[in-house]
């Protein structure tokens, strides 16, 4: 099946995301035994967007930054180095207990020791993403986007990001952009919000041209029954 794309679009792909950094011990060591780490800028959605960006296609990232944060500056420089345009609010840290960029503590594993990842997301600035920070009419109308890639991670991160992703899907659809939606179910993100997120994910899925997920994703996000045992 062939999918046609809007031809007058400035951007080949757009992704909404919450940016953070990953700390990985050197030489395959366990995290708790290490004192030297490699720090990398990361997000699931920009991992996807890196592919068209490095193939020379124009990509845009919608995210949020902590104002005057050196981590935010590192993230911006990294996105620029991956040939991506970025746009988003500069949010005040609000003191030592305020907003920050998430940390991903990644033990890569070695031999029979499997990899382990711990997400340290308290105060994550990306949870504040909201349509009020963006001119969606300009982005999808005047500028134009061929395809939007949405992830269930950012879609379930907070009530604000859930609505943000739904607003993006609606705006994209109304302006002729294609939509790719990776359901990416995470039980810890859905806890206590099951019905709310089911309704939002179902509407985003109904607007999407491409759905990505395994059997469990479709069952738990969209309520689609699996085969009988």
Where are each of the predicted segments found?
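Glycine-rich phosphate/adenosyl-contacting loop at the front of the ribokinase-like
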Residues: 2-89, 112, 131
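A short, aliphatic-rich alpha-helical micro-motif
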Residues: 8, 138-143, 202-205
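Conserved beta-alpha-beta core of the PfkB/ribokinase-like small-molecule kinase fold
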Residues: 147-229
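Short glycine-rich anion-binding loops that position phosphate/pyrophosphate groups of nucleotides
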Residues: 19-20, 110, 122-125, 153-155, ...
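A generic local structural motif
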Residues: 1-3, 132-137, 197-199
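Conserved N-terminal subdomain of the carbohydrate kinase-like
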Residues: 58-152
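A glycine- and small-aliphatic-rich helix-loop capping segment at beta-alpha/alpha-beta transitions
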Residues: 29-33, 135-137, 166-167
């Amino acid at each position: 099946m062939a999918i046609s794309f809007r031809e007058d679009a400035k951007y080949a792909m757009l992704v909404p995301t919450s940016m953070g950094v990953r700390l990985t011990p050197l030489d395959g060591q366990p995290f708790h035994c290490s004192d030297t780490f490699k720090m990398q800028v990361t997000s699931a959605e920009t991992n996807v967007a890196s592919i068209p960006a490095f193939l020379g296609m124009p990509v845009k990232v919608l995210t949020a930054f902590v104002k005057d944060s050196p981590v935010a500056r590192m993230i911006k420089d990294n996105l620029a180095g991956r040939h991506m345009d970025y746009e988003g609010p500069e949010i005040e840290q609000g003191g030592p207990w305020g907003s920050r960029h998430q940390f991903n503590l990644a033990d890569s594993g070695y031999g029979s020791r499997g990899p382990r990842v711990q997400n340290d997301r308290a105060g994550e600035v990306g949870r504040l993403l909201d349509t009020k920070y963006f001119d969606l009419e300009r982005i999808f109308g005047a500028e134009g986007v061929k395809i939007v890639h949405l992830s269930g991670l950012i879609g379930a991160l907070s009530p604000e990001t859930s609505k943000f992703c739904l607003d993006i899907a609606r705006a994209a659809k109304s302006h002729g952009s294609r939509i790719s939606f990776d359901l990416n179910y995470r039980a810890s993100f859905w806890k206590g919000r099951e019905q709310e997120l089911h309704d939002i994910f179902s509407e985003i899925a109904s607007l999407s041209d491409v759905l990505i997920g395994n059997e469990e994703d479709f069952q738990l996000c969209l309520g689609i029954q699996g085969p009988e045992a």
